[in-house]
Amino acid sequence: METFVRLFKDSPQQRSNAWHATRRTQVGGSDLASVLGLNPYKSYYITLAEKANLFKKNLNHAACNWGTLFERVSKDLLELFCQTTVIGDNIHIDGTYLGYPGHSNSPDGFCYLTLGYTQQSWEIKTIFNDVCYETTKRIPVLVEIKSPFNRKIKNSVPSYYVPQIQSGLALSPPISMAIYVEAMFRVCGIHQLGWNNETNTDIHPPESMLPLAWGIITICSTQEYTEAPQDFGTLNAETFHQFLETLYQKDQYTIHYSTPYETACPEMSNVVGYFGWKVFIFQIIPVMKHPQFLKDKYPIIQQFLHDLHTIQTSPSPMEAYEKICCTKESPLSTEDIDDFTNMLT
């Protein structure tokens, strides 16, 4: 696993300008469900328009930023709960090296997990498992992390995330299993941190259970900042959403994470504010590799890349886009047209 990750040490770092530029010309793992028509939130056509830069601007949703914000926390908790170390969480795997040019995957990382065998089955060993296993084994896995803002967490992988996971497995030959990590985080004021169910109930409904862990996220300005820090965990829902919308814009802030179970704010310079978090659900679902998945789906990726190239090289990209939409077997839906009208020039 370590040798495989080192192969991509010089790849564009995730969320860097080079990474964004590269992904605009490729079908990434997170694009795949949309390209395959499996994403209920974004279609083939909207993804095509997005890649062709036909939007007025890149959309920046609070829910997406929420997921990005808590990805690091989920990795810290995974390492703690499973006694492991996540590596390769910043690499970009270009599928060209395996014969899939134009396709890529940016994994949330790789780690070793301990599997314990008992009662004729294997399970993932965590610090919460008080079980005496008949035998154990350590295996390398791909990590995929999601932290939904509102969506109810179920004990299964949502169908529209399966292509992203299988893409990562297909482009990682040494790995035969992935884990889908899904966590439910809630925001709280610093004074609410600890072994209790207190949260900001203006942002999310109250929780009846106790948290698995908690901690602090600190936001610092990249410029000199001398005002008193604000407890963002006490904001009302509308203001907190606005805060999330601007968090990753124009490199205004740096984000710092406490270790789990911390309750004291760190001593730092240029602190704009901070907020507490609590995690109430943290589930780890194993996903086995389907060896033929990418081979079977790659023709659709190639068609998408062909459509994208047609638009980008056309003297009239909008006309080329509209022609593609009208000639496909599944034309734009009413919902797509509404979204299209709002987002395109």
UniProtKB/Swiss-Prot annotation:
Matching InterPro entries: NF-kappa-B_Signaling_Reg (IPR051703), PDDEXK-like_dom_sf (IPR011604), Restrct_endonuc-II-like (IPR011335), YqaJ_viral_recombinase (IPR019080)
GO cellular component terms given for this protein: host cell cytoplasm
Pfam family, one: YqaJ
Subcellular location: Host cytoplasm
GO biological process: symbiont-mediated suppression of host NF-kappaB cascade
Major location category of this protein: host cell
Transmembrane segments: none
Keyword terms of this UniProt record: Host cytoplasm, Host-virus interaction, Inhibition of host NF-kappa-B by virus
Record's function text: Plays a role in the negative regulation of host NF-kappa-B signaling pathway. Mechanistically, recruits IKKA/CHUK and IKBKB to suppress their kinase activity towards NFKBIA.
Quaternary structure annotation from Swiss-Prot or TrEMBL: Interacts with IKKA/CHUK and IKBKB.
Name assigned to this protein: Protein D345L
Protein species of origin: African swine fever virus (isolate Pig/Kenya/KEN-50/1950) (ASFV)
